[in-house]
A protein has these predicted regions:
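Short hydrophobic beta-strand segments
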Residues: 1-9
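Extracellular/periplasmic catalytic domains that process cell-envelope and extracellular macromolecules
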Residues: 1, 70-74, 102-105, 195, ...
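Surface-exposed patches in mature extracellular/periplasmic domains of secreted proteins
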Residues: 25-31, 168-169, 272-280
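Extracellular ligand-binding/catalytic regions of CAZymes and related secreted enzymes
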Residues: 11, 112, 118-143, 196-199, ...
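A structural signal for well-ordered alpha-helical segments within the folded catalytic domains
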Residues: 12, 93-100, 104, 151, ...
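Helical hinge/lid and interdomain linker segments adjacent to catalytic or ligand-binding clefts
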Residues: 11-125
Length: 284
């Protein structure tokens, strides 16, 4: 199992997906514990465990994770949950440089809505054109099938009940901060046409390096996980008011969560150009 750092945020509840993917509670700890999933408190997000989990201790601040390359290095994958805005003042130049160095060394970063700030403010090349327009509301988006893994995502979503028709995804509360990807570096996976927007894109790192020199990866999402996970019992929430996992009230995977599950497996896999067909792992 990869070692994963997850930062919470007050505008989504990415941490609730961990439970739905079947990760045992014993695997969720603070960094000094033995768990493979370590939580960090982002802006207005959940910041402590419930009394029956890790003795109710507080999460370290997200700045303790992204503040330096040394604190990022222990992790194979960093998951950044939406904070509701970019909040660059809570990150800073040292953090932007550290995250870029982390991905260049082979680290994987999943950047949820508003975490495009890492790619806009850090020493990355321009991988997308951004916008500050209003959210899109509910949308039927296109799953891009012009590359092998996009086609696989489309087929998989139909198989697991995430899509009714191949090549389409119904999105609840679609966001609109990405207009289009820069094809020199990035591949779009899910997009809207009216208005034009990208809901998922990926890029291998170091960006611009030859493929055989790229071992890291970033995924940028404009989807909220909790926005698609609503039941009669409410919506999953992340807030200092909810000790984890009390803010996680839904069960089962929404279509948006199923997409994220696919993307998490992809971002954790061996890095290959998105234009190539993934090969089965070598069994020794």
């Amino acid at each position: 199992m990869p070692k994963v750092a997850l930062t919470t945020g007050g505008a989504d509840a990415l941490e609730c997906l961990v439970r739905k993917l079947g990760i045992d509670a014993s695997e969720v700890t603070n960094p000094e514990g033995n768990g493979h999933f370590n939580f960090f408190a982002g802006h207005d997000g959940a910041n402590r465990y419930g009394s029956d989990l890790n003795a109710g201790v507080s999460f370290p601040a997200a700045s303790k994770l992204w503040g330096s390359l040394d604190t990022l290095k222990p992790y194979d994958l960093v998951l950044l949950s939406c904070e509701g805005a970019e909040y660059p003042e809570e990150k800073g130049d040292a953090a932007f440089k550290a995250m870029a160095a982390y991905t260049a060394l082979g680290g994987r970063m999943f950047a949820s809505h508003w975490h495009q700030v890492w790619l806009k403010s850090g020493p990355f090349p321009t991988i997308a054109r951004y916008t500050g327009q209003a959210d899109l509301g509910d949308q039927t988006a296109e799953v891009v099938t012009t590359f092998p893994k996009g086609k696989a995502l489309s087929e998989w979503l139909v198989n697991v009940g995430g899509s009714v028709r191949a090549g389409e995804l119904s999105i609840t509360n679609a966001q609109h901060t990405i207009v289009e990807e820069n094809p020199l570096y990035a591949q779009s996976w899910i997009r809207t046409s009216s208005p034009e927007g990208v809901q998922y894109l990926s890029a291998n790192t170091p960006m611009g390096a030859p493929p055989d020199m790229q071992c890291g990866r970033v995924v940028l999402s404009d989807l909220h996980v909790a926005g698609g996970a609503t039941t009669a019992g409410g919506t999953d929430s992340s807030s200092p008011s909810f000790a984890y996992p009390s803010g996680c009230v839904t069960s089962g995977l929404s279509p948006q969560e199923k997409v994220l599950a696919f993307m998490l497996f992809d971002i954790s896999a061996c890095t290959i150009p998105d234009s190539e067909v993934p090969a089965p792992p070598i069994v020794k």
